[in-house]
Structures are given as C-alpha cells and as structure tokens.
C-alpha cells in the first residue's frame, strides 16, 4: 500500500515538468539521431547503443534487454529505489511540493 496518494493531475504535471531527455541526460550521455536519442544501456553491458529515448512520447526503451518505461520508471531503475522515492526526487527537481 503506497504511503502517499498523488492526484492524477499532480502526477501528470510531475511527468510534464520532468522532460525525459533532460532527466536521462543527467545520468547518461545521449546522442540525437533523427527524432530519437540513443546511448549504451545503463542497465546492461553493451558496446553498440541499443537504448533509445523518445522525447515526443516521453518514454525510453532498450532493444537489447527490453527495459523501458516513463521518467518515473527510469529514476526507479537508476536510483534503485521505490516509486515513492522516485516521485520525491522528480518533485524536488521540478520544484513541486509533495
């Protein structure tokens, strides 16, 4: 059971204020190719980039290991934290009150 309830409007604003390209770029180096951003996946070892970030759709996906999701999911995986902590991190970045 989650400790906190986040109204859908607040959660949507959190994701809107945290552009996925900006957040992912704060952890790894992305290279733009066309409409996508590419990098070697931070979640498995690889030599050829298979990790993509789609700014328009605000999601990420790795064609190598299959991991993917939205900005909250990315922070959960990078920080090895739960959803509550990821939301707290993103709210702080966006200057939003919890």
Sequence positions of predicted segments:
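N-terminal structured subdomain of primase-like DNA metabolism proteins
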Residues: 1-98
């Amino acid at each position: 059971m989650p400790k906190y309830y986040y109204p859908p409007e607040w959660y949507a604003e959190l994701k809107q204020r945290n552009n996925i390209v900006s957040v992912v770029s704060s952890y790894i180096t992305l290279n733009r190719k066309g409409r996508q951003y590419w990098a070697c996946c931070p979640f498995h070892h690889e030599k050829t980039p298979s990790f993509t970030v789609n700014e328009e759709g605000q999601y990420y996906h790795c064609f190598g290991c299959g991991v993917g999701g939205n900005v909250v999911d990315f922070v959960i995986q990078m920080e090895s934290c739960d959803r509550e902590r990821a939301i707290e991190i993103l709210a702080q970045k966006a200057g939003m009150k919890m």
